[in-house]
Amino acid sequence: GYNNVEIPTTLKSSLTTKGEVDYSQKLQNLISEQLVGCGFNEILNNSLTAASYYEGSETYKNENLVYLMNPLSNDLNVMRQTLLFGGLESIQHNANRKNADLKFFEFGNCYFYNAEKKNPEKVLAAYAEEYHLGLWVTGKRVSNSWAHPDENSSVYELKAYVLNIFTRLGLNFGNVVFGNLTNDIYSTAISVHTRGGKLLATFGIISKKIQKAFDIDNEVYYAEINWKELMKAIKSAKVNFKELSKFPAVKRDLALLIDKNIQFAEIEKIAYETEKKLLKEVELFDVYEGKNLEPGKKSYAVSFLLQDESATLNDKQIDKIMSKLIANLENKLGAKLR
């Protein structure tokens, strides 16, 4: 009976505590809140997808797909290499229900297989998993009303969202390289790499071929950020506080005649390399292509904001900086003043 049950002389117990959210998770929550504040909705798609999406793709090759041994169907027979197609399925689903003005974001894993890394002793050596953030923008940015007309979304709107994420996380733009990207996913796109060559992000306009395959009428603007690489890039970022300058900033404008293949990012890079201390901002405010220009040329109107934190800049200092800047743009890009 119960009278014969042994009662231990010591009582053992354990306490559990809630584990701390890691740094990456905190920043993910921060960016999620930021995107929701910008009108985005978070989506969560299946990591399983259709191998047919990757057929003939040079960017996401069939040979890098992770196949399931016993798939439920051909629509769920591989692990995704990109978040893109899941988001396009969500856009298609909404557009078919007359909801075409959309902004989505998703955090999720992408999976890759590399046969060259295959090792009999390490079964998982050939497989890789990356954590990504995807952004989708399509349809109207502003709907028609008495206060304003319709305004469509654009790739520049998407670019602003991507750069705002980088800025919020404290990424040093001096340590990254922006470049043109040409592949079968985008019709026009930009890539963002670290100085060490690691890919941080791509963003641009989805190709008409893919858009048509999903039966989507409006252009789709898409960005994919490698979250893990971004976390590495901002690891050394520090938040610095300083008082507002007591001395006025000075703006100077240049009208530059350049080759059509030259991008604003190249001008911006040369400008910051030329004057690292006093140059605060470089902005492109006008682009002209057409009559009265040489064939193969375009005109960029660029403004440069200069400011000294400790004194008022005089004309001699400003002219010296601008002369040096003009010389570097001419030598490196063949730019001419109009």
Where do the protein language model's features map onto the residues?
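Extended, well-folded interaction surfaces typified by the phenylalanyl-tRNA synthetase beta subunit core
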Residues: G1-L102, R252, L305-S310, K316-R338
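Long, charge-dense accessory insertions within large macromolecular proteins
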Residues: L88-H93, Y113-N114, K209
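A carboxyl-terminal module marker
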Residues: N3-I7, K26, N45, E121, ...
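Short, structured patches in soluble enzyme cores that scaffold and shape functional sites
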Residues: T9, N70-L72, N109, V137-G139, ...
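Metal-dependent nuclease catalytic core centered on acidic motifs
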Residues: L102, Y111-A115
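Short, flexible loop/turn elements at secondary-structure junctions
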Residues: L72, G108-Y111, G196, D286
